[in-house]
């Protein structure tokens, strides 16, 4: 976790104006936000590597917003200054005192710096101070650091080994295998530049050479030799000999050949610089322990890879190992690789002995034995003493040379031992420093471990809390699932109940609809029945009123008949004149009693005559109600009259209007005890004979009404001939009962013969006027009307002598009694005429009923 940001007053104690100028370059509009691209372009001018800049960005933008505000940009500038000053890039180093950051840009105010004494050295003062601190931490010995001590520091940079080897070669300016303070600063400077993706130069540029090293002349390709060891004290003993030699030389007694060999000038090395650099890279890769030497085991694979023989490789190894140490330094390894390259590429065999230009530069400081040997025997002067002295001098010189050789060998051994001791000391110091570093790392690891333990404990607590919460949530989820399941089951049951209720509701609604339809149909049927009942009641009332009138007429007729009987019987001794007067009186009485009624039949002469002017105005004369068949289209009683809309349009098919009985199922008068008036009678029909037919054989009795009086109560004629004998069709008893309605179920049967069958041949009432057109029979031929009897004359004639022709005409019960008499069947106020709309006696134009007429009645208008 990133440390909390430090206030700006502590982060930037000085140089606020400089930081403000930097911020103005990236945010000239002062929006308070610096984008990632603008900040990256500006920070790259610092010369730092992308890795360091990425770390700086992460620290400056800890929340990962993708941009920097003013405070974050100041933190980034401060971290850049830390990196340029050699400090670690962390937020904890923001409080350190350090120079402001520098950016390679013309607009940067730090590009132009005042000249100083050390301005020509590339290592800045602050870097030098930092490198000096690191140098002191490595515990240098006599101001020098060996390769073993510098190696861990260089390895921490994670640079490739060849780059680190090149850095070592460039920084070891005096080639002594150690780095002093300035050389270490150069090495660290090169390492930091390499970390910033800058290439390491092949040769050290003059700007990187420390000022302390520039006083020495460095020849190209030459390397300064190690400082020689101080001469031993006993070497001073050879001074007299030198002096004597000098004296001898000055006297010219010795040959110039016997003088000491002079120092030879420095020659170039046979190994080219480019090959040397390439061989050095191979050496750094081979020198895994970085001790500056490679053993035979380390280079064996490289040498064997060349394909040369082992003897030749052993000879090359012996030539390169000039000091016979069993190891090769960097220059010796380069020389050996040069010999192998010459043999492989050019076929040049290595020499047997090294020439002066083949000796590595680091090995040229040690003089080899004088190949000329000691001083040669001088020319003999002929003086024995001088010759002895010369020989003694030569012997002393040889001894001196051998002693010097021994001294050099001893000094070399001492140097080797000292070097070994130094190396052991270095190893000890290195191990000590490594131990200290390990201890520090151990302490850091322990601290981190403690911190991790604390975090682990916290995480365990958090984990336990989370687990507890998970358990609680799991229990809650399980309980919720249980509730959901129960609710789902309840919901399902409720849905089932709802579906059942809906189905029951639908069924009830359908049943309600059916009942409503049935009720509606029943209401329509009831209304129809009520209308029919009302119409029937009206007809009954009319029939009752007419019946009462007929009763009165009958009584009057009976009284008249009784008077006639009395007159005829001679009870009062009256004459025929009195009988005629009585007849006239009865006629007047009848006319007076029936004056308000209009008999539609009037008299037979008028009834059956063709003179329409003598007849009473017929209400059915202007329009024939039977001109068209009202039931031609459809039979209203064929089926259920309430099955469909009773007001719907009638069907066009021809059906029987009385095909179905509307009272078949429910007769409102079924429970009455009185017999049906229209029920089929077992007795003879009173209308089987025509009352208007003339009796062919009159009885001997002069009374024409003795046997054929239809209104006589004491008539002895048979019940079959008397239409009113036993059963009065207009009696009050039949209409008082509840079963006074006609039985329409028997309408299809042929009706009995009517009272007009004898006179009209049964055509008057033989057919049902409401019968279908197909069932209507043809009418019989018309017969002339019977002649009426002559009225009695004024002469008195005995009763015994009277014949049928002389018998006075009996009053016609259907004859109108007065001029103002009306039709008893005509509709009155308060009475309904059942035949008001359909007149069965309307005249017909044809003798036979036509197909267009549905009437089954005979046409009485043409009967004469």
Swiss-Prot record:
For this entry, the protein name equals Epidermal growth factor receptor substrate 15-like 1
Q: How does it sit in the membrane?
A: Peripheral membrane protein
Q: Which organism is it from?
A: Homo sapiens
Coiled coil feature spans: 386-553
Name all EH domain ranges. 15-104, 127-215, 275-365
Answer yes or no on keyword Cell membrane: yes
Tell me the residues on which Phosphotyrosine occurs: 74, 564
A Pfam match is EH
Q: Where are the sequence repeats?
A: 618-620, 640-642, 645-647, 650-652, 656-658, 661-663, 667-669, 685-687, 690-692, 709-711, 728-730, 754-756, 806-808, 812-814, 833-835
Which terms in the GO cellular component ontology are assigned? clathrin coat of coated pit; cytoplasm; cytosol; membrane; nucleus; plasma membrane; presynapse
Modified residue annotations for N-acetylalanine: 2
List compositional bias (Low complexity) regions by residue number.
241-255, 365-378, 705-724, 843-855
Q: Disordered: where is this region? A: 221-261, 349-381, 614-864
Residue ranges, annotated region (Interaction with DAB2): 15-368
